[in-house]
Amino acid sequence: MKIYFAGSIRAGRDDATIYETMITWLRSYGEVLTEHVGNPLLSAAGDGHLKVACGPDNRYIHDRDMAWLTACDLVIAEVTTPSLGVGYELGWATVLEKPVLCLYRIIAGRPLSAMIGGSPGIQAAEYSSMDEAKRIMEEFIKKTAEGII
């Protein structure tokens, strides 16, 4: 199974360790195409470990990520930190009819976007612990594999 994991990069890296934990756990279910999102050394400037010292340009990142999004079997996003890029990816994922799960934590003053919570193509789920997030992801992956989603 090819998994596309989405999480904030340029909008902030406060949740990078959460992404890393989720991605490490998701590897037991298949290939995580975007595992760099969980790299704690990845800065808000982007994935500079690729291509050249200053990092790949925006067009390269866009085209690479769109190829991964097209190739994936499902999308899992951690959307607690709002991100324009993640929103773009989720919009395309729904157009491509990919199964999409968005996980988020409740943080005062930062409600889930109505465009995520109200989308019929997106399953959104609140979690308060990593164990709960893993249970939600496992159920989503199993239902996707069984063709229920």
Where are these regions (language model features)?
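Conserved catalytic or regulatory cores that recognize and/or transform ribose-phosphate-containing ligands
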Residues: 1-149
